[in-house]
Structures are given as structure tokens and as C-alpha cells.
Amino acid sequence: MDKKIFMDYLPEELMEFGIQPKFRTKQLYQWVYRKYVDDFEEMKNIPKDLKAKLKKEFIINPLELINHEIATDGTEKFLFKMHDNHTVETVLIKMKDEEIKDGKIKEAKYTVCVSTQVGCKVGCAFCLTAKGGFVRNLSAGEIVAQVWWMKKFKNFDENKALNVVYMGMGEPLDNYDALVKAIKILANPDGMNISPRRQTVSTSGIAPKIKRLGNENLGVNLAISLHAVDDELREQLIPLNKAYNIESVIDAIREFPIDKRKKVMFEYLVIKDVNDDIESAKKLVKLLNGIPSKVNLIYFNPYPGTNFKRPDDATMKKFQDYLINKGIMCTIRKSKGMDISAACGQLREKEINK
């Protein structure tokens, strides 16, 4: 692609391209990220010569929306095409409806599940994304644009709050530089102004980069795709564990700066007759000792060709009750978007006519 992607850049970087004075970058950010304008010609307070320069050098929005599906539970999945015809999927989940309380409208709460790569290198045994292999990293702008589309599409300035989770296609920490820049762009007060406290990075456990992310002091939340409590099983489920075993991941988490009001989220995908027994729950309690933790139990979502099976509700409840009785906050994630393949582990690149 000959032109640069506007959404790839922080305001100070735009100034290096000759976009001066400083207030111009603020105006541009507000047009793009507050008014959702993706055509420089529509920016009324930008000088004509600057518009011409920008049109020649930049495209604003790098994603083309080519498909939109809505599940029976209201979960929405978006398929985007990029300049090279590769595609990524983004999922929007409504967590809480608007409500009227004391005569005031309380905002609805949504979570957008953002992709960071086309495909994935990690190769988790239970995840459909990795079946097609790794294709490429997304740029910061291609990550940011997924959130931009959600805010534009759903008019999020009207009684709607949006949280961002980097839990879509790909391993976020394997695309580290673009991830960090995207976090900063989303948080910029002249733009979408999504605080890092409302952004969660989910990782399968690249221990050195967990430490590096902590040293950035961005204030983001951390989620760990744990899924097993011993290395032998975790290596079968998550091959990355051969490079970074459970102990190294836990050590990195202990060094990660956690807001006193927050906890580290541990995602535990429960697979029938694999990791759903009480002995696994006991080991999990021991493993998380001393870490401010919240465990999110996730039903395995079957897909064509897998031998893994979904656990029953009684087993999930028994596992949850054991953790709670041991003082660990634990929730069971309600699988959303299963009928449109938008649930955990079901996202993948789609073939399109090229």
C-alpha cells in the first residue's frame, strides 16, 4: 500500500510529517475519533492545502466492513477486509442494557473483542484461529480501526460505555509494538479517550513480554489464558508452554503492576474429561496463592473436526464452587455468539473472493 494509515500514528508522530501547528493534530484526531469522519474533505476547519497533502499521503480508515452477523443473544460479529485482501473478525458483546434509575438513563455496557493478528503462531489445540496458521501482524491502525468501527456503528456517545479486550484473533504480545501503540492511541484524550483501565490485554503467556508490558506502566488490565495447572497438559493445549512454562508465567505476573482495585484475570477453558476435575481446581488454588486473582471459567465451544467436548453445567458449577469456597473470585463466562461462530476460540480468517 502506497499511502500511510492515519490511524497508525500518535499526534506527536503526525507532527513529524509536517502537520503543524500542534492544534491541527488535535483537530484531526477529533474529526476522526470523535466525529468518525474518514474523508479529509469533510473536515471543515482544516485548510485546503493541508487537506490536499493529507489526501495524497494518508488513508484514514484501513478496514472495509464486508459482513455483519447478529447472534440470537445479541452478540455481533464483524468481518473486515484490509488492503491486501486478508480479513479479520471483531466481536461486540452487550454486557448490560440501558436502564432508568432515579429518573436518569444509566449507560449500557459493551465489550469489543479485538484482533491483533491474521491467524496466530501459538497454535492452541482448542482454538480455530490457529488452524489456518499465522499470516501477518496487524498494524496499530488496523487494531484501532476495529474499535473505531464499533463506536461509529453503534453511536457509543449516546449512553453506551465500551471496554476493549485484546482477545480476538492472534496473540497480542506477539505483536507487541503495534499493541502498545494501539493502547495509547485509543487512550488519547483528544481521540476516543478509552482509558487503559478499560482495556484488557489477554495473553497465552509470553513471560518476558508480560514483564515488558508491566514496565510500560500503561495501566492496562491483564488476562492470562491459563487453561491448565500442570506443564504436561498445558504443553498439549498451548505449545507455547514449552518455551514459557507455568512457573515463568506466574513469576512474570507477580511482577506486573496491578491497580489495587483490580485483579489479574485467569481464563480457564474447561474441557470435558481433560481439565474439569476437582484435583485441577485444587492445583489452581495453590498456583494462584498470593496473586489478586479472578478466575473466568469458559465452556469449550466445539467446532468441526475437534475431539474436545463441552463440559456439562453441573461440572462447571462444582469447579466454580470449589474455587469460591477457597476465597478465589470465580465466574462462569456465558458463551455468547455461538450460533455465528463468535464465541471464544471460534474466530478465524475468512476466505473471500479476491
Swiss-Prot record:
Keywords: 4Fe-4S, Cytoplasm, Disulfide bond, Iron, Iron-sulfur, Metal-binding, Methyltransferase, rRNA processing, S-adenosyl-L-methionine, Transferase, tRNA processing. GO terms for molecular function: 4 iron, 4 sulfur cluster binding; metal ion binding; rRNA (adenine(2503)-C2-)-methyltransferase activity; rRNA binding; tRNA (adenine(37)-C2)-methyltransferase activity; tRNA binding. GO terms for biological process: rRNA base methylation; tRNA methylation. Its cofactor is [4Fe-4S] cluster. SUPFAM superfamilies: Radical SAM enzymes. Its EC number is 2.1.1.192. It holds the Pfam family RlmN_N. Its main location: cytoplasm. Disulfide bonds join C113-C344. [4Fe-4S] cluster binds at C120, C124, C127. The keyword Iron-sulfur applies. Binds 1 [4Fe-4S] cluster. The cluster is coordinated with 3 cysteines and an exchangeable S-adenosyl-L-methionine. It comes from the Bacteria. Residues 106-339 form the Radical SAM core domain. Reaction proceeds by a ping-pong mechanism involving intermediate methylation of a conserved cysteine residue. Specifically methylates position 2 of adenine 2503 in 23S rRNA and position 2 of adenine 37 in tRNAs. m2A2503 modification seems to play a crucial role in the proofreading step occurring at the peptidyl transferase center and thus would serve to optimize ribosomal fidelity. This is Dual-specificity RNA methyltransferase RlmN. It comes from Nautilia profundicola (strain ATCC BAA-1463 / DSM 18972 / AmH). The gene is rlmN.
